[in-house]
Amino acid sequence: MTVAPPPDAPSRAPSPWVVCLCAQWCGTCRDYRPLFEEVARAHPHLRFAWVDIEDDADVAGDFDIETFPTLLVADAEGTRFMGPLLPHAATLTRTLAALRAAHPSEADVAALLAALAAAPARFELAPPAA
């Protein structure tokens, strides 16, 4: 396993992890690694790791990976993405940008949920069954 963690300032939450789950025998994974490392260098605010699910089985645990490479993006709040990804630097970069844009602040989520709760008949598609 290779890990490239940036130093975290004590005053902020830990950086999200971007983990490529791969296998040494996978030619696509071997070709993808330099591109993955290039994206890692371009995003120093994130932590990147390369995990060979066979060589690093003690770390990979029971992940059932069927398609390589598989990407896992997770932070302190949970899994943001897990699935196979086309092995292109541009695809990974777009995925990371989309995940960052799609992660609203807790205040924004709380405000939306409060508005929905205040007028459920206006928004709810089907009321919950009694």
Predicted segments, located by residue:
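Local sequence-structure signature of Cys/Sec-based thiol-disulfide redox active-site neighborhoods
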Residues: 2-39
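Non-catalytic, surface beta->alpha helical segment in thiol-disulfide oxidoreductase systems
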Residues: 72-115
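Glycine-rich, charge-decorated loop segments at or immediately adjacent to ligand/cofactor-binding or catalytic sites
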Residues: 60-65, 109-113
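Charged phosphate-binding loop/patch that engages nucleotide di/tri-phosphates or the phosphate backbone
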Residues: 110-130
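Active-site/pore-lining binding-face segments in mid-to-C-terminal subdomains
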Residues: 61-70, 74-77
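Short alpha-helical
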Residues: 27, 55-58, 87
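Thiol-based oxidoreductase modules, predominantly thioredoxin-like and allied folds used
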Residues: 21, 41-59, 65-67
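N-terminal/domain-start segments enriched in small and hydrophobic, helix-friendly residues
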Residues: 6-9, 13, 92, 99-101, ...
